[in-house]
Amino acid sequence: GKERMHRTSGIIPGVMAQTGMETSEIIQGIVAETKPDVVIAIDALAARSTRRLNRTIQITDTGINPGSGVGNHRVGLTEENLQVKVIGIGVPTVVDAATIVHDSMAHLLDTLEETEQKEFLEEMIAPHLHTMFVTPKDVDETVKYLSFTISEGLNMAFEEISE
C-alpha cells in the first residue's frame, strides 16, 4: 500500500499584545480564504487543579476561547464564529495562586462548608495574588515534550493508508 497525508496547513497567530489583532480575526481571514474542512486550535490552558498542570491534554469539539482561563476573555475559536468545525486541543500550563493554596490545604478545607472554604481562601490570598498565574520552572522542556506528543497524534490522525 501507499501512504498519503491529508493536506494541512498551520499558523501561529500570536497574541493580541504582539499582533494588535484578535486571534479570531486572523483565523477568520484564513478560513474565508482557504475554506478548510476543520480548524484545529491548540492553546495553553489554566489548570483548575495542580494535579492536572502539564499532565493532561484536553480535546473538545467545541473550540477554544483564548484567554478565558486567566480572565482575559477574547473572541472564541468556535464553529459559530468561524463557520467551520473546530477541534480544540489544550494543555493546562498555568495555575492561579488560589488553586495552589486550595490544593495545598485540601484536607483542612474538606472540613469546612463550601461558603467557609471560599471565605477562608479569600482571607488567605492577598488581593494582588488573585490575578497571579504561575507555571512550573521546567515549562519550556515540558511544552517541548507535550507539543511533540500532540503533533504525533495529529500526524497519525491525518494519515491515510490506501491499499
Q: PLM ranges: what are they?
A:
Residues 11-12, 41-43, 88-92:
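Short beta-strand segments
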Residues 69-92:
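Short, flexible loop segments at boundaries between secondary-structure elements
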Residues 6, 35-37, 82-86:
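Short glycine-/polar-rich loops that comprise or flank the Walker A/P-loop
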Residues 89-163:
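C-terminal functional extensions of proteins
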Residues 18, 22-26, 34, 137, ...:
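Conserved active-site and cofactor/substrate-binding residues in soluble primary-metabolism enzymes
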Residues 16-17, 45-48, 93-95:
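Short, catalytically relevant binding-site loops at active-site mouths
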Residues 1-10:
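Glycine-rich phosphate/diphosphate-binding loop of Rossmann-like nucleotide-binding domains
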Residues 24-75:
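Glycine-rich phosphate-binding loop
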